[in-house]
Amino acid sequence: MLNRCLGAAISSSADLLRAIAFAADKHRDQRRKDAEASPYVNHVIAVAELLARVGEITDQTVLVAAILHDTVEDTETTAQELADHFGTAVARIVAEVTDDKALPKEERKLLQVEHARDASPAAKLVKLGDKIVNVVDVTNQPPPTWSVERRLEYLAWAERVIAGCRGTNAALERMFDEVVVRGREKILQEAGAA
């Protein structure tokens, strides 16, 4: 029995590490928009870590999808490639949270709001984690070119997206609400001091 439990844990850890290695390779030339131009892979790891720590998510499919959530949207990775390497369940979740980059940005943002309410519970979890991490980054390490107005608009848009994810995970939803309130306060404070 113990060997079976250890084997499952090792397999789960191996799957997560394999996903991190895959994401690190796919995002290797990408950087975040912050002033430090931090490695993009830090973002996807932060999303998965947040889901596990705050949301107490243990479903490996969700955590692997969180790590891979931007690979199809932001790299040359295909949904079929994800399915081949990580299974169709992971590929489906990633597909649900992937924007169609062929569409104009404003249309993509509107579609995120519309699609959130109909997303699977797993996709809603990934979306919650992604938006929490992004709101924290926009608050504390914004892209240098973003104005106060643009930062506040991002927070308001994120709230509209997450409205469709409500009822999925109370701890993550609470954290989202907290980071938005703190973010708005900090951004407005910084604007007043400028």
What are these regions (language model features)?
Residues 1-194:
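Active-site helical microenvironments for divalent-metal-assisted chemistry
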